[in-house]
Design a protein with these regions (language model features):
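RNA pseudouridine synthases
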Residues: 1-117, 121-126, 148, 170, ...
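Pseudouridine synthase
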Residues: 15, 29, 118, 126-180
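Small/polar loops that bind or transfer phosphate-bearing groups
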Residues: 55, 135, 226
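Short, surface-exposed linear segments at secondary-structure transitions and domain or protein termini
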Residues: 164, 193-194
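Short terminal alpha-helical segments
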Residues: 195-208
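Short amphipathic alpha-helical coiled-coil/interface segments
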Residues: 213-221
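Long, low-complexity or tandemly repetitive, helically biased scaffold regions used
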Residues: 222-260, 264
């Protein structure tokens, strides 16, 4: 497990996907650093990214207070199907069905309903689109259900309507900011797939393929001849790549055949 920072009070780590944030991660921190470890916030099992843990009771109290008061800012990146607006500020009422472990957007407050707010900025002009999100409330499945309810399910999120080959939602805790001893600490880490420039290049090449005029096909051929596509389609450290944008024209398996077609 990767450490971004640690001292006698704090440990900031990159939680891997599939590791439980309330048991396995603290155990790994203790095994590496010794002492104690206290959980002050959590991530779902299927979500990776930046987390902070307290190593003393005093630090745990201070960090928990930051969470409760909203001074711990949590930001995420994700890939969503479709292309949402450039930015947004969404507030919804969410209701969780515990038996199904699924959350739904409802139209009015009632027993069991919680309000949920996030803001976001779209970082790429592609489909799927790269989006950066700030959470103002930490509701169960909040990001997943708020985007899915607007017909932009997360790539890989089959529970909330995605129909693609990815095995888990492409959602990552990319940044934590919080007050600490009179100053503000900020820790940021991006996964390999959160590359807006790469997504825009792939989207532009798909658009060129769709248009199929001589200039576009020449640009597409040059892109493939240059070898740039190899870097654009490399898998990240978790083996997940946004390999097929809208229709998967430029998947690795199809590049050779596509190049032959372009050269006709």
């Amino acid at each position: 497990m990767q450490f971004l920072y640690h001292d006698k009070d704090l440990a900031v780590v990159i939680k891997p996907v599939g590791l439980d944030s309330e048991s396995a991660v603290p155990a790994a921190i203790i095994a590496e650093l010794g002492g104690e470890c206290y959980t002050v916030h959590r991530l779902d099992l299927i979500v990776g990214g930046v987390m902070v843990y307290a190593r003393t009771k005093q630090a745990a109290a201070a960090l928990s207070r930051a969470v409760q008061e909203g001074t711990m800012v949590k930001e995420y990146v994700t890939l969503v199907h479709g292309m949402p607006e450039e930015s947004g500020d969404w507030t919804d009422y969410l209701l969780k069905d515990a038996k199904k472990n699924k959350v739904f957007v409802v139209d009015r407050p009632r027993k069991g309903v919680k309000d949920a707010r996030l803001t976001f900025t779209r970082l790429s002009d592609s489909d799927p689109a790269l989006v950066r999100i700030r959470l103002y409330t930490g509701r169960s499945h909040q990001i997943r259900v708020q985007f899915a309810s607007r017909k932009h399910p997360l790539v890989g999120d089959h529970k909330y309507g995605a129909r693609d080959a990815h095995k888990e939602p492409m959602l990552y805790s990319c940044c934590l900011t919080f007050p600490w001893k009179g100053r503000e600490l900020r820790f940021e880490h991006l996964p390999g797939w959160a590359d807006a420039a790469r997504l825009n290049r792939i989207a532009a090449m798909e658009a060129a393929y769709d248009r199929r005029n001589p200039e576009d096909l020449a640009a597409l051929a040059a892109y493939m001849d240059s070898g740039d596509w190899r870097a654009d389609y490399e898998a990240d450290e978790q083996g997940r790549i946004p390999r097929c944008m809208k229709r998967g024209v430029l998947s690795q398996d199809g590049l050779y055949n596509l190049l032959q077609e372009v050269r006709k």
